[in-house]
Amino acid sequence: MFESTRKNIQPSDATLVITQTRGVTGSKQNHRDTLRSLGLKRIGHQVTRKADAVTVGMVNTVPHLVSVEEVNNG
């Protein structure tokens, strides 16, 4: 398991737990839209997603607003 907030996440078969760590006040509109697309609504909110290319791309768009943990499926 690792925690990351940088743009180093790669698509894989892993499951990601994505947590919103910062608010969206003052953020760009596309960053707000990306968080909503991930299903994040407020600080501290967590969602679980597969690490496919779409999810990884969205996480890499807002690394300064989220923290990511990889959960082993085994």
From Swiss-Prot:
Pfam families xrefs: Ribosomal_L30
Keywords noted in UniProt: Ribonucleoprotein, Ribosomal protein
Keyword flag Transmembrane: no
GO molecular function, one term: structural constituent of ribosome
GO-annotated cellular components: cytosolic large ribosomal subunit
Keyword Ribonucleoprotein tagged: yes
GO biological process, one term: translation
Coiled coil: none
Oligomer and partners: Part of the 50S ribosomal subunit.
Protein name according to UniProt: Large ribosomal subunit protein uL30
Species, as recorded: Micrococcus luteus (strain ATCC 4698 / DSM 20030 / JCM 1464 / CCM 169 / CCUG 5858 / IAM 1056 / NBRC 3333 / NCIMB 9278 / NCTC 2665 / VKM Ac-2230) (Micrococcus lysodeikticus)
Lineage of source species: Bacteria, Bacillati, Actinomycetota, Actinomycetes, Micrococcales
